[in-house]
């Protein structure tokens, strides 16, 4: 997608609302070597507080100045959210970003243990993760690598039942 945007001289926008400040300090852009022109952030950025951010180079961001481009937002600069964000960024970046390494290790261990539990109980559940983000799927494939595989092989009814049973136990994901 990025290559096509460059070819046709269209801005490359990356939505990191879910992944930004969660899978790596620079989100999936960092993990996959992407160079977006505009990026949006949310969720992990505020650590549960309503906050969002738009980032890009000066020549693009200047267009958001008052009067040039209409921009509204429901998560613009809440003080408590800004404090939580500042604190999270400071803590996660200490020790050469040790916080990100730690949550990534925890995510890897969680996925590994859940996959082992599924195998031990004969379930066709696979837990895939990128750092601390993980998701279980019910499939006979070893891994889901594209949307077609997901649509053709994942047992959504079994996932819905599993999700409900987990919620009944107070586990939400």
Where are the regions a protein language model picked out?
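Conserved N-terminal phosphate-binding loop of PLP-dependent enzymes in the Aspartate aminotransferase
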Residues: 1-173
């Amino acid at each position: 997608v990025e290559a096509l945007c460059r070819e046709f001289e269209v801005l490359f926008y990356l939505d990191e609302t879910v992944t930004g400040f969660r899978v790596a300090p620079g989100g999936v852009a960092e993990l996959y070597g992407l160079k977006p022109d505009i990026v949006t952030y949310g969720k992990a950025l505020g650590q549960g507080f309503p906050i969002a951010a738009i980032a890009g180079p000066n020549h693009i961001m200047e267009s958001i100045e008052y009067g040039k481009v209409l921009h509204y937002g429901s998560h613009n600069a809440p003080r408590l959210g800004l404090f939580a964000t500042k604190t999270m960024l400071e803590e996660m970046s200490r020790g050469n970003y040790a916080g990100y390494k730690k949550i990534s290790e925890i995510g890897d261990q969680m996925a590994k243990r859940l996959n082992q539990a599924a195998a031990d109980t004969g379930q066709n559940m696979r837990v895939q993760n990128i750092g601390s983000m993980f998701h279980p799927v019910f499939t006979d494939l070893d891994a889901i690598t594209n949307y077609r595989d997901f649509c053709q092989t994942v047992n959504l009814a079994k996932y819905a039942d599993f999700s409900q049973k987990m919620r009944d136990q107070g586990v939400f994901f």
